[in-house]
Amino acid sequence: MLRTHTSRYIKCICQTIKIASFCLIFLSIFSAATAETTGSGEMKVTLLGTGSPVPSNERFSQSILIEVEKQKLLFDLGRGVTIRLAQLDIPFRDITASFITHMHSDHLVGLPDLWLTGWLPTGFASRTNPMVIYGPRGTIAMTDDLTKAFSEDIRIRLADEKLPPKGIEFEAHDIGAGLVYQKDGVKVSAFETHHGDLIKPNFGYVVEYKGKKVVISSDTTYDERIAETARNADLLIHEVAIIDPKLLKAYPRFKEIAAHHSSPEDAGRIFSIAKPKLAVFTHIIVLKEQGPLDVSTEEVVARTRKMYSGPLAVGHDLMQFEIAEDVRVLDRSETH
């Protein structure tokens, strides 16, 4: 009787393994199919997180995905980056490289999640190579410290699950301004922007491929270096802050927040100089005395229009743009 039960049990396990293997094969095929998201010469940009440090289920923290051919490049890794990637059916192992604008936590808290979860032996993870990351001074030190902080988890999984050691390593780079990444015709360059006198270095990024150009401002005050860098760009992604004047009077600390960011009018001036094919708002900071802490599209557009009359979009999470001969917004509900 024991042998019969054991035999049935083994057969059940084998059937389960066969099903699991089939699922993994299916996921691999599906991932390969979804990886072909762009055609020759095209770029796809997805706003994964368009919010601020304030927790929101509508707007996760800052993160942008740029897909070029088979490369998937992440810019900042804010809160919820793994959730947004999962919503797009993008396996975490498929991220080619990540780029950090500056060392503020709201741009980084998703890094440990993507790093650790991306190593797990699942259909959406299973990274076998080091996680490649570029960022300002302190990036290498941060990745070393993360490895120490999670050393027990790493030790346990190496021993218990026999996960590939290379998959939990970092290939980290402390960068300066200039060309920081080049692969198969894709170029990523960093340039400094002003987020505050003590927040240095603070990098914006330029992504170029076959004559197409996407510029990311990073967190910034009014800075004409952004306008010069983004002249005639296909897509200029810029931050914006809307702070109730009453709060500025009542809470002097909020003046410091305002002094580190761009108003809609500031951004509009940058857009009017740069003249991109499309200007897009992200990292949207809203501080109000009353009402929901979410952007009033009408207000941000009206204030921007005082300085800029060109194509404009107010970003939201999972908003996508395809860049070929023209810039196509896949969700036009927030274009103006």
Give, region by region, the residue ranges found by the protein language model:
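N-terminal secretory signal peptides that target proteins for export/translocation
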Residues: 1-15
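Short regulatory "switch" loops immediately downstream of catalytic or recognition motifs
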Residues: 1-3, 117-121, 148-154, 242-247, ...
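Intrinsic disorder/low-complexity segments enriched in polar/small residues
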Residues: 12, 16-19, 37
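Bacterial N-terminal signal peptides
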Residues: 16-29
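Binuclear metal-dependent hydrolase catalytic cores
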Residues: 34-214, 294, 299-328
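Cap/insert and terminal regions of metallo-dependent hydrolase folds
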Residues: 203-204, 211-215, 221-319
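A polyampholytic, Gly/Pro-enriched intrinsically disordered region
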Residues: 330-336
